[in-house]
Amino acid sequence: LFGGLLDKLKEKIKKYCNKENLDKACSKL
């Protein structure tokens, strides 16, 4: 259950990073 929440959070972060083009901050993910 907790792992599923982490996956959803990562997906949100990836989408935000793609939209904002924050390559340096998002390359860590």
From Swiss-Prot:
Keywords annotated in UniProt: Disulfide bond, Secreted
Localization terms from the record: Secreted
Cellular component terms per the entry's GO annotation: extracellular region
Signal peptide start and end residues: none
Top-level taxon of origin: Eukaryota
Tissues showing expression: Expressed by the venom gland.
Assembly and binders: Heterodimer composed of subunit SS1 and subunit LS1 (U1-PSDTX-Pt1b), and heterodimer composed of subunit SS1 and LS2 (U1-PSDTX-Pt1a); disulfide-linked.
Family, per entry: Belongs to the myrmexin family.
Additional comment: There are 6 heterodimeric myrmexins which consist of a small subunit (SS1 or SS2 or SS3) disulfide-linked to a larger, quite structurally unrelated subunit (LS1 or LS2).
General function of this protein: This heterodimer may have anti-inflammatory properties, since the myrmexin complex (composed of 6 SS-LS heterodimers) inhibits carrageenin-induced edema in a dose-dependent manner (after subcutaneous injection into rats).
Name of the protein: U1-pseudomyrmecitoxin-Pt1 subunit SS1
Organism listed in the record: Pseudomyrmex triplarinus
